[in-house]
Structures are given as structure tokens and as C-alpha cells.
From Swiss-Prot:
Organism: Syntrophomonas wolfei subsp. wolfei (strain DSM 2245B / Goettingen)
Protein name: Large ribosomal subunit protein bL27
Pfam families, A to Z: Ribosomal_L27
Parts of the chain that traverse the membrane: none
UniProt modification remark: The N-terminus is cleaved by ribosomal processing cysteine protease Prp.
One biological process term in Gene Ontology: translation
Family: Belongs to the bacterial ribosomal protein bL27 family.
Domain of life of the organism encoding this protein: Bacteria
InterPro entries referenced in this protein's UniProt entry, alphabetically: Ribosomal_bL27 (IPR001684), Ribosomal_bL27_CS (IPR018261)
Gene: rpmA
Length: 97
């Protein structure tokens, strides 16, 4: 007669993949033009997510919350109330001789 000798040995069933090993590209956010710098119309002043810094005089806000100058002038960072910041652009004083 036939006899079956069934033996089960340890073996590796499958190898899982690591959940690490990827990273998103940096978004290069932050202040691009600082207080006192001279800018031209259209220059980006701040790249941000949300309104950490609010637009002041002569500054507009883009669809992705980017702040940009709408006139040529000098950048000025100011407080807006107690806990908010804003950035404005003031026209350069023309000097006559």
C-alpha cells in the first residue's frame, strides 16, 4: 500500500514593499522680496499657502495666495492689527534737482 508522508516546511510566502522611499518636490514658498527692496509692477513678493501675510496698498493676491506688486516702488512689511501682517508697496519719491 501507499503511505503519504506529508511534511510542511517553513518557507517565505511573499515580500512586502517598503512604505518609505518617496518625497514630494519642495514648493519654494516664502518671502521673495524683503522690506526696503525696490520692485517693479508684477514682481512676486510672497509665495504662500493661505493668507499668512495679507495684501496691503498696491499689492494684489493671486489665485494660489501669492502676493505681487501692482506698481513700481519700495516694499514695506507692516502689522495689521495685533496679530496679522501685511505687505505694501509704496511709490518711490521722485527727486528733483
Amino acid at each position: 500500500m501507499f503511505t503519504f508522508d506529508l511534511q510542511l516546511f517553513a518557507h517565505k510566502k511573499g515580500v512586502g514593499s517598503s512604505k518609505n522611499g518617496r518625497d514630494s518636490q519642495s514648493k519654494r514658498l516664502g518671502v521673495k522680496r524683503y522690506d526696503g527692496q525696490i520692485v517693479t509692477a508684477g514682481n512676486i513678493l510672497v509665495r504662500q499657502r493661505g493668507t499668512k501675510i495679507h495684501p496691503g496698498q498696491n499689492v494684489m493676491i493671486g489665485g494660489d495666495d501669492t502676493l505681487f506688486a501692482i506698481i513700481d516702488g519700495r516694499v514695506k512689511f507692516e502689522r495689521k492689527g495685533r496679530d496679522k501682517k501685511q505687505v505694501s508697496v509704496y511709490p518711490l519719491e521722485t527727486m528733483t534737482m
